[in-house]
Amino acid sequence: LLFYYPLLSGKVLFQSDIRQYDGMSRQLKDYRAQTGEETYWIDNAFGGMPTYQLGAKYPADFLSPIYSFFRILPRPAHILFIYLLGFYLLMTVLKFPWQIGLFGSMAFGFSTYLLIILQVGHNTKALAISFIPFVIAGMLLLFRKQWFWGFILTSLSFAMQIRSNHYQHQSSVLNILSTSIALGVYNII
């Protein structure tokens, strides 16, 4: 909270990519305001493109209430919170003492690259990265035969990771999951 104190006092972090997003998604927002309906195609960006990356809303989005829980903090402080929480949970699942878990989560959350992508507004990338420790922690719980919590954590965090809408890191998580499953099957055989 101290790191993002200016945000908590009402100031707004200028994120260049978010400003560009506002321009790219203007037609989508105007259409939604005029008709009350959702469009999945706009023609003002790149000569026409789908709106899946520009803030389209989906009727069966059950993950929004979960994501709203993290949005109690202003953007992008809420993403930093998810970084810290996810890595601390991973360290806890790995059975590190809480002091090492706290230090590890601070080292992860305040690493230079993760802060830079927040500064410039790569929020979807940051969100995708923030849920990776949750996915890994869930997989570890599954390997330890803690089926219920492992399934809940893996499926919810992977769904949130997909919801972040950043395909590059979704493929990375799929690689982690498939490698983990392959190693698990190998150890069983």
Region locations from a protein language model:
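Alpha-helical structural context
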Residues: 34, 69, 93-94, 163
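Membrane-interface coil-to-helix junctions
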Residues: 1-84, 106-133
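Membrane-embedded helix bundles of polyisoprenyl
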Residues: 86-89, 93, 99-188
